Amino acid sequence: YDPLKDIEFLEFELDMWYFGILKKGWEKFTRIVKQENQDIKKALAKQLSGLNVNEEIVQNAIKILKLDHHPMQWNEDELKKLARELRIATKPMLIAANKIDVPGAKLNFDRALEKFKDYIIIPCSAESELALKEAMKHNMIKYIPGENNFEITGKLNDKQKDALEFIKKNVLQEYNNTGIQQVLDKAVFELLDYIALFPGGVNKLEDSEGRVLPDCFLMRNGSTALDFAYRLHTDFGKNFIKAIDVRTKLIVGKDYKLKNKDIIELAVRK
C-alpha cells in the first residue's frame, strides 16, 4: 500500500469533476461565445462561478497553457489541462500525513514532501492527540493542544505511563507537536486566509460568567469593521456608528481593515 497513491487519486478525481463540468455542453457554449463575440474569460468565469472561478483565474490558466486559439478548437486534452489549472487555483489542498508514528511513515512523509512540493504537508498523529486530550479530560495531565509537551498531574498506571512516554518520544519530541492543531491553523489562516476576531469592550473583556473573550469569529482577511458589525448582527451593521480597537483604544471607521486577533468594540445607533 502506497499512501501517495491516495493523493494522486484525489487529485485525479477532482480534475475529472472539473473536466466533466467543462465538457458538458462545451460545443454549444463555445458556439454561443463565438456568435455573440463574448470574452472567453468572462464567459468561463460566469459558467464556473459555482466553483469560485473568476476572470483572473481563467486568464492565468489560459496564459499558462498558451491557449491562444479559439475555444472551439480546444481539444479534450487541453480541456483536461485547463480543468486541472482551475482546480489548483480554486481548491487549495493541505495534506495531513496522519499516523506519522507508525513504522515506515517517516519515509512516506519524506517522499510526499519531494513529490508534492506545491502542497502544505503536515506530519500528524490524530491518535496521539486524542490520547492526550482524554488524559487531560480525566485530570491526568496538563496539555495545551499544539504544544510540544505535557505535564503529568494525576496518578497513572504503568500502561498509561508507557503510552504517554511513547507519544512524548515518537511524536512530540520527533515532530514538535501532534500536528492536529497545526493542520487546523494552516487550513484556516493560511489556505483559506481567515482572521480571528473577538468582540469585546474597552472596559470589559469578560462575559456574565467571568469568561474572558469567550466568542471568536472567523472572517476573510481584508474584512472591515462594518463587515464585522454585520457578521455579529444585521442591525449592528445597519446602525453602525464607529468601532474601537480595544487594545489601542483608538476609534476606527467602517472601512478600517481588521487584523488577526483584533478585539473590537462597536458603537451603534439604538
Task: Indicate residue ranges for each PLM-predicted region.
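Conserved nucleotide-binding/hydrolysis micro-motifs of P-loop NTPases
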Residues: Y1-L4, D15, K99-P103, A126-A131, ...
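Residue-level "contact hotspot" at macromolecular interaction interfaces
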Residues: L218, K257-L258
